Amino acid sequence: MSGEVSYYAGQTAEEAVARIYDRSGRPVAARRWRGVSGEIDLIAREGAEVIFIEVKKSTSHAAAAARLSRRQMDRIYGAASEFLAGEPRGQLTASRFDVALVDALGRVEIIENAFAA
């Protein structure tokens, strides 16, 4: 997949995942939020809890899951910490890390609380 095609496929996947969160009463507060440490695809809220969402797209859900590396998780943790610093409760804000897997047919599988800091 070329860089441009990959970029638009990723955007489409993120949009589909954002719709799922919005429809389930967990509004997306930020898209592609960028901090010094890295980028977070989507940030949603469920009451007072902040949900950091990493979206992975590939031919299958298993292939998408395999694309999430430890190094990438570390960057997400760093960016999440930066985001939480701006919250009223700071690092004490309830939060979780979800992973949304999107396959070639556009089917979405969400793994809530997929990894922890």
From Swiss-Prot:
Family matches, as InterPro entries: Restrct_endonuc-II-like, tRNA_endonuc-like_dom_sf, UPF0102_YraN-like
Membrane-spanning residues: none
Gene3D superfamilies xref list: 3.40.1350.10
Entry-linked Pfam families: UPF0102
A GO MF term: nucleic acid binding
Family according to the record: Belongs to the UPF0102 family.
Name of the protein described by the UniProt record: UPF0102 protein RHOS4_03930
